[in-house]
Amino acid sequence: MSDNGELEDKPPAPPVRMSSTIFSTGGKDPLSANHSLKPLPSVPEEKKPRNKIISIFSGTEKGSKKKEKERPEISPPSDFEHTIHVGFDAVTGEFTGMPEQWARLLQTSNITKLEQKKNPQAVLDVLKFYDSNTVKQKYLSFTPPEKDGFPSGAPALNTKVSETSAVVTEEDDDDEEAAPPVIAPRPDHTKSIYTRSVIDPIPAPVGDSHVDSGAKSSDKQKKKTKMTDEEIMEKLRTIVSIGDPKKKYTRYEKIGQGASGTVFTATDVALGQEVAIKQINLQKQPKKELIINEILVMKELKNPNIVNFLDSYLVGDELFVVMEYLAGGSLTDVVTETCMDEAQIAAVCRECLQALEFLHANQVIHRDIKSDNVLLGMEGSVKLTDFGFCAQITPEQSKRSTMVGTPYWMAPEVVTRKAYGPKVDIWSLGIMAIEMVEGEPPYLNENPLRALYLIATNGTPELQNPEKLSPIFRDFLNRCLEMDVEKRGSAKELLQHPFLKLAKPLSSLTPLIMAAKEAMKSNR
């Protein structure tokens, strides 16, 4: 199959997904899903200013200093925070001491009084999730403006972080990547988010164990570990290649413009290879140290099922990141515009599990597995991308506790803020498999807060039409979506699951990719 998508013997067109199962909640809640009946919604309306949500935390997220010549390790939490104490009266079924903004969110969340009484702690967990000072957007996914979409073949690399108080939506960011022709992005509440760790802090020295004094020591820690801009630039100079990318790559074609950077396709002069190049203005990056983290991780993670990092250059304050370009677009385009059969789903799951087995063997958790972060080659290759959220686990810290990822794909242990490990990626893969069946993840038609509550309390989601799936596929889903982490399958174990033996050749994905592109063209 050539990249131009021409087939000599054209097979019957694959089934196209005629309509989405998403329905608007119809409420006035600004956090409610606002979907049309089309598979992909129209361009989001201009965001109105939101009231700032009162934070239960006293500090801000800290950067961590990276070690020379090593993949950066995410340090154990050192922010000892003083929190607001919220109580729950079991008799009246009311919360006490709740900040006014939280109360407003709860009123419009569609979480019923019965649900609140049944599990008040889960309610508080999801409210904390929306705290304005804990929600952070991914730093390295590129931000396309409304008029310039990026082809999904260009790996995500964020060049803007909004400092605006946010729930799941942000004023300027969009880590979903559109394939030409430009299509409307998915709903804002399907974007990736990051919240700070809430793991119990490392015991403080005697005499400093009180939470308030811990907060003071947190400030000292931040001063010690925060990298200055000059230190960051110096570190970048040690990891990038020397030279001018404008001379090593030619035929630059602008395919997108973000608030602080530009994305191009270009051709490697020496190899004749088409690549994606991100030109990032570092002066507009508030979290430059996270760029170092992702570049170092990407440089070290070489695998056939991971989008390949090729090179990076620093010219003044401009960072050029060269990545593999996949012309097929993102899996999101396929799942929202076409209907996949089980054998095609098995093929995608197998490729993703191969990537996850490699990552987990290298003590790396991706933490944001979803169809948007799976890119396809025109010949059907399947590759994971977007390592802005990845975390390294170490012998000293084998579990993470930061709430990271995208709400609808999050594992219950992440939503409930428990310590977690690599199997959060397996849960997200299971949700992505449902996405491939139904065109969207479970609970997407719910208010985001209630969706998080349902994930935390219900656990394994119900399928819309389970009887239509084969027993072997249902068993695979059950192994991925097992609430008990110990019983949930690992990537290595699931690669041996009988369902994957049903997989069609990867070339079977090519007609779906082409059909998705045609459908998007007609939706313009």
UniProtKB/Swiss-Prot annotation:
Activated by binding small G proteins. Binding of GTP-bound CDC42 or RAC1 to the autoregulatory region releases monomers from the autoinhibited dimer, enables phosphorylation of Thr-402 and allows the kinase domain to adopt an active structure. Following caspase cleavage, autophosphorylated PAK-2p34 is constitutively active. The modification N6-acetyllysine is found at residues 62, 128. A motif (Nuclear localization signal) lies at residues 245-251. One of its GO terms (molecular function) is protein kinase binding. Residues 67-81, 209-228 have a biased composition (Basic and acidic residues). SUPFAM superfamilies: Protein kinase-like (PK-like) (SSF56112). The record marks 212-213 as: Cleavage. InterPro entries: CRIB_dom, CRIB_dom_sf, Kinase-like_dom_sf, PAK3-like, PAK_BD, Prot_kinase_dom, Protein_kinase_ATP_BS, Ser/Thr_kinase_AS. The modification Phosphoserine is found at residues 2, 20, 55, 58, 64, 141, 152, 197. The modification Phosphotyrosine is found at residue 139. The active site is at residue 368. Residues 74-87 form the CRIB domain. The modification N-acetylserine is found at residue 2. GO terms for cellular component: cell-cell junction; cytosol; focal adhesion; glutamatergic synapse; membrane; nuclear speck; nucleoplasm; perinuclear region of cytoplasm. Full-length PAK2 is autophosphorylated when activated by CDC42/p21. Following cleavage, both peptides, PAK-2p27 and PAK-2p34, become highly autophosphorylated. Autophosphorylation of PAK-2p27 can occur in the absence of any effectors and is dependent on phosphorylation of Thr-402, because PAK-2p27 is acting as an exogenous substrate. Residues 249-500 form the Protein kinase domain. Its EC number is 2.7.11.1. One of its GO terms (biological process) is adherens junction assembly. It catalyses: L-seryl-[protein] + ATP = O-phospho-L-seryl-[protein] + ADP + H(+); L-threonyl-[protein] + ATP = O-phospho-L-threonyl-[protein] + ADP + H(+). Interacts tightly with GTP-bound but not GDP-bound CDC42/p21 and RAC1. Interacts with SH3MD4. Interacts with SCRIB. Interacts with ARHGEF7 and GIT1. PAK-2p34 interacts with ARHGAP10. Interacts with RAC1. Serine/threonine protein kinase that plays a role in a variety of different signaling pathways including cytoskeleton regulation, cell motility, cell cycle progression, apoptosis or proliferation. Acts as a downstream effector of the small GTPases CDC42 and RAC1. Activation by the binding of active CDC42 and RAC1 results in a conformational change and a subsequent autophosphorylation on several serine and/or threonine residues. Full-length PAK2 stimulates cell survival and cell growth. This is Serine/threonine-protein kinase PAK 2. It comes from Oryctolagus cuniculus. The gene is PAK2.
